């Protein structure tokens, strides 16, 4: 995820570059997305000139509809990115009329004291831009995500001539992609992927299901091309695949490909004449690919001797679920084709030779590596030294770097930084109660006891015990034993005041968790409902209830 801020200290004017998300893993159950805490820039929103977006990947625009309402500033983006963020705001019923400014490719916007030039690069999505940010202190090149693709197939080529000119004009600092800094050679071209995918399509004789990143429109066009060349129809499966296709056509791309057919109609086409292009290349539980493999998709069926083509890489952290998906397919007699056995995917980020080209074009005085893990940043620092950059600067989240001509760049301050976790539609911190409780429940289960007692400490009826997620095989035995422990604990208390009642609740909580630990090895999240009842006559009761979570 990305959120960068550039500011001029003397007049306190700021711009933001990108507002992205990352996707949560199993360590934060119930949370889907995480985005950078924008608190630092919210405090400066009166001096914020705008948000500038480099391209439309989720780690660069995914948080825009969550963060923008707190800022209410102008947004600057090229046409394809603009179409996708308009949809994001529509989904949340947020009106940005008058705020979104569509920027033409290779053009410049003036946000005094900044002048920002959009420079076309190549990446794994349409309209990726590097930003040449002119400031009174000097020029900065913010690369965004990029690579050097000599044949991107769709969209413009990397504007290397303009990059060379920018380098000759002088660049104070380059903020540069580090993702593939460990990879030798070049990242590869979409044209090479097309050639190899066509060979795969020509070899296969049954139903073909291709899964790829929906945002890679060049890859999408390649699958359309291969389908047409081999006499097959194509059907798009998955919401994001349809969304990207629609956005691309709206912006003038994909005009020459065959029209896709509805997946409901595709069921009537013979196996050897249909290709499905679907979402779920990372094994996402609700992705189309996962549903197809589990035979729960309403329209797409897969059977023995069909082929599934994974035209994508495995994102770190997804290995286990993807290998499980691959194995399930193989068990069903389905051929699995991936970058492990065919050259059918290339990265969208620069390998070392691509980086070398950029360094030679830009000739920056300083380099700030970004976009990658800590180990990538360190390796990129070493690469910058190898390229004779005078000032490689290592940064961490929240670092404020001072850039000024003639001076060594330095981290001179720290901005408050952190992560915001979207829990449902509520932004929370990682240590929020809801996340802590959910983690506890996922590991240890949940137990609840409801008890009615008189002021003298007599239990009215038996305690009502319920639990979820505990490895209990003899329910009656477990519940009976816990009831006895609850009764034993209650007998040690007299309930003359509220404090004693609260103390009893705490004691019951300990009793329940201790008993569960002894019997199951688990200390569940425990809820005690304690009702103090006053019985004045057989048919009339008044109760006060207390509930505590722990």
Q: Which ranges hold each PLM region?
A:
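Hard-cation-handling environments
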Residues: 182-311, 315-317, 321-340, 344, ...
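C-terminal tails and terminal domains of large nucleic-acid-associated
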Residues: 501-532
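Single conserved hydrophobic/aromatic residue that forms the stacking wall/gate
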Residues: 533-550
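Conserved hydrophobic residues forming the short capping helix/wall of the S-adenosyl-L-methionine
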Residues: 89, 384, 516
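Conserved beta-strand scaffold positions in the cores of enzyme catalytic domains, especially
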Residues: 100-102, 173-175, 308, 336, ...
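His/Asp/Glu-rich metal-coordinating catalytic cores
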Residues: 1-52, 57-269, 287-301, 320-322
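Hydrophobic packing residues within well-ordered alpha-helices of enzyme cores
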Residues: 64-67, 85, 380, 384, ...
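Histidine-centered active-site/metal-ligand motif
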Residues: 55-60, 123, 142, 344-352, ...
